[in-house]
Amino acid sequence: MTSETVLEIRNVSKHFGAVKALTAVDFRLARGEVHALCGENGAGKSTLMNVIAGVLQPSEGEVLIEGAPVKIASPAVAQSLGIALVHQEIALCPDATIAENMFMAATNRRRSALMNYAQLERDAQAVMNRLAPIDVSQKVGDLPISSQQLVEIAKALTLDCRVLIFDEPTAALTETEAQVLFGIIRDLKARGISIIYISHRMAEVFSLCDRVTVFRDGRYVATEMVSDVTPDDVVRLMVGREISQLYPDKQPSSERLGEPILSVRDLGGERFRDVSFELRYGEILGVGGLIGSGRTEIAEGICALRPVTQGEIRLHDKVLRLRRYSDAAKAGVVYLSEDRKGSGVFLDLSIAQNIAALDLKALTSLGLLNSREERALAEDLTRRLGVRMGGVDMPVSSLSGGNQQKVAIAKQLAVDPKVILMDEPTRGIDVGAKSEIHRLLRELARAGIGILVISSELPELIGLCDRVLVVREGRIAGEVSGNEMTEEVIMRLASGIGPATETNLKASGHAA
């Protein structure tokens, strides 16, 4: 890192109507540094990055590149200035190939009637191979979320940039994929490229970054050398308070008795088989495993989002016969997707419309929607979940990623479910918002709702859940609880490294 400033933000504000997303913020990025930007969801991090990347225009203030004021009127202008943004949310064309997506921005700037697509594909494959051995001739829509995130990163690497912005780049990646990305970031830094790194994961901030800047409530708080602060210091700056307990108290084992809310027996389908477990009253059941292990497919099978070829599902000891997701929701089994923008929320609709979407019939009389009841429902749930917004009439697209996730959860709660299956419910959410959601999930469990949480974050599985099922290659490899619930035990079961001992596995036949 040098002392030379490559990018400077001076007194930038951004307003959306009466909502102030940014208020007179400053930011400086040195050449060849990795600079972390931290803050709770709604703090203004992504808004500032969108200003730098030309997606949004500032209401006030200026942006300087190497000391010269610039007007970044569009993403194309940003790219011409050497600025690239890797979005937290997937921004790819699903019907185009990986290669076409990777070079779409570059070819738009130098389009030719004699475009050599064979060469383009070879170049794309060379870049992609730095991250993962993924065939770039595939369509993006056929890839899992983690692979789509790698394509987003590869797309940015094809641009000749001096400033590269990563917005929660590891949220959908496996640990192995994340480590490959970290190596690439260190290589880019060594070549003098400046990196802005937005993350809620303190371990990544402290292992990768030179400096950290903290925003809170749309305002600049502080910039510190990473070597001069601790993770607790950064969290205190982010939230303006101490977070005394990220995870609520667990259910006492003595209460984990009685009839199960949900029973799954010998369930099988594409990419999963012989899945059996019970979800009991008052508990939060975790599901861990590597990405691609079949965790999501099991949840989708339970709620009829994908075909089931064998087994049975019982809700309060009554066999469920589900043909489609609407049958599951009507029965009281709902699913929160890991892809909140793909299937979790409708970005262009209002917050109130999103929350009411699963059960419009309950808010309708004689064919007319009762907008007063819709609004009251939305206001109640957004208050309980702590959604930061200008009002329930605002479009979901106006919210930060974490607040969009809260709306997605509120949408499921609006139908008074008996069981909620949550796939990565806190992915990309800051520590303060995570704490709120964890407390909410525990309250729901205590109220009698069955909660199943799929998570790639081992601390979340261990800290939040009463028991954890570990999935490997489409089957439940084991179940852990109590003192046996450690990261090492879960990872050994997930990866199949070494034998699974009897102390790690329950006697219920979960071992693969």
UniProtKB/Swiss-Prot annotation:
EC number: 7.5.2.7
GO terms of molecular function: ABC-type D-ribose transporter activity; ATP binding; ATP hydrolysis activity
Organism superkingdom: Bacteria
GO cellular component: plasma membrane
Keywords for this protein: ATP-binding, Cell inner membrane, Cell membrane, Membrane, Nucleotide-binding, Plasmid, Repeat, Sugar transport, Translocase, Transport
Reactions that this protein is recorded to catalyse: D-ribose(out) + ATP + H2O = D-ribose(in) + ADP + phosphate + H(+)
Main location group: membrane
Binding site for ATP: 39-46
Topology versus the membrane: Peripheral membrane protein
Domain ABC transporter: 7-242, 257-498
InterPro entries: AAA+_ATPase, ABC_carbohydrate_import_ATPase, ABC_transporter-like_ATP-bd, ABC_transporter-like_CS, P-loop_NTPase
Gene3D superfamilies: P-loop containing nucleotide triphosphate hydrolases
Subcellular location: Cell inner membrane
SUPFAM superfamilies per record: P-loop containing nucleoside triphosphate hydrolases
UniProt subunit comment: The complex is composed of an ATP-binding protein (RbsA), two transmembrane proteins (RbsC) and a solute-binding protein (RbsB).
Function, as annotated: Part of the ABC transporter complex RbsABC involved in ribose import. Responsible for energy coupling to the transport system.
Family according to the record: Belongs to the ABC transporter superfamily. Ribose importer (TC 3.A.1.2.1) family.
Protein name (record): Ribose import ATP-binding protein RbsA 2
Source species taxonomy: Bacteria, Pseudomonadati, Pseudomonadota, Alphaproteobacteria, Hyphomicrobiales
Name of the gene encoding the protein in the UniProt record: rbsA2
